[in-house]
Amino acid sequence: MPAMTPAFRRADLTGFLRTYGAALILLLAAMLAWQPAQAQLRVDISGTGATQYPVAIADFAVDDTHGRALAEVIRADLTRTGQFRLINAAGSGLNVDSQVAHDDWRAKGADFLAYGSITRGPDGRYDVRYRLADTVKKGQLDGVAFSGTEQELRRVAHQIADRIYEKITGVRGVFSTRIAYVLKRGSTYELQVADADGQNPQVALRSREPIISPSWSPDGSRLAYVSFESGKPVVYVHTLATSARIPVANFKGNNSAPAWSPDGSQLAVALTRDGLSQIYIVSAGGGSNMRRITRSPGIDTEPNFTPDGRSIIFTSDRSGGPQIYQTGLDGGDARRLTFNGGYNISPRISPDGSTLLYVARRDGAFRIASLNLSSGSETLLTDGRDDQSPSFAPNGMQVLYAAIQNGRSVLAGVSSDGRVRQTLSVLNGEIREPTWGPFTR
């Protein structure tokens, strides 16, 4: 067997030996009902996209307080992408029925203008109507109405931002999607789910012992993860709406690194039940049925299905150092994908299957890299010293990862071309192992 370097040992089994290897003792986990989490967030953004679309977002009329808040969420969503340049729309006086003075807005530098109205109905629900104007072509690009409670208005704002993003760029927006991550506060670990902007965090699971490797089901209704509560790592599938969960990999040895098949029926996992860590497939519904995929003389871990469900990307040290490979579900010969550098781990593949994302060690630093699978061209997306756990947004345009800032682990994001970066700091804890959820509607 090839020698396993300390660095690869750190990364093996999705990082739990790196961080928690000394913590394999009798554990006690407290599973909680779906509940709000209290977190103070700070978002910092730097860089701009190669193309910036000039857009004005007017405050929504009639209900000034809610209309202003609605517009602020939309502006913040678009700003975080780095693809939009906001044009001042203060004092526009527009409502959803206004006639747009296209030439005037064009003179202000806005190629696009979003505006609308929000009113409270007799049933207490809010009616939101929005329009998107193209000031260059002097026409309406989009117009739609929403209805929701006061608590749902932020979600409505994200939906409007999604529509604006798609109408202007041609790419589906991700502002209405969710993210999951592990938050560590003191000696407590929380598996949290939040909106894509980090707001509205909810606790899915709280434990005094480590929770690692969260992975979204394709429909966004469940999370698979590894919990140590039984005295060893066990893979669970957790239904978010009910907090019900089942163990799906609880074999002898370590059970780790769950990844969903595209149809949501199976999970690829890394198991040591037969010796070294190898890749297996188990049912997402539980049970003892499983199928071994890899049989190598090295350590195989961190599996991920390709979008077509026909093969698996994984990390292995079979060539001497950790590199990324691809194999069919029949377990045939694996094909090596990464050749730059001696250390590449934590693979993720883009939703369209064209790009590989991974952690690359370069000049002693762990950085997020992307590989064009057609050309073989590698791009280093980040410049941190210890960047970990990359995850694609469901539209493939952004990448979520964990970074170290001022000695603390924070949530970070970068555009898929590396030009725009953002960090989201939780002021009373450390964020680990983020993963971006799928489109759900």
From Swiss-Prot:
One annotated Gene Ontology cellular component of this protein: periplasmic space
Keywords per UniProt: Cell cycle, Cell division, Periplasm, Signal
A biological process term (GO) from this entry: cell division
Disulfide bond annotation, renumbered to this chain: none
Main location class: periplasm
Signal peptide boundaries: 1-39
Cited InterPro entries: 6-blade_b-propeller_TolB-like, PD40, Tol-Pal_TolB, TolB_N
Subcellular location: Periplasm
Quaternary state and interactors: The Tol-Pal system is composed of five core proteins: the inner membrane proteins TolA, TolQ and TolR, the periplasmic protein TolB and the outer membrane protein Pal. They form a network linking the inner and outer membranes and the peptidoglycan layer.
Described function: Part of the Tol-Pal system, which plays a role in outer membrane invagination during cell division and is important for maintaining outer membrane integrity.
Cross-referenced NCBIfam families: propeller_TolB
Recorded family membership: Belongs to the TolB family.
Protein name: Tol-Pal system protein TolB
Species whose genome carries this gene: Bordetella bronchiseptica (strain ATCC BAA-588 / NCTC 13252 / RB50)
High-level lineage: Bacteria, Pseudomonadati, Pseudomonadota, Betaproteobacteria, Burkholderiales
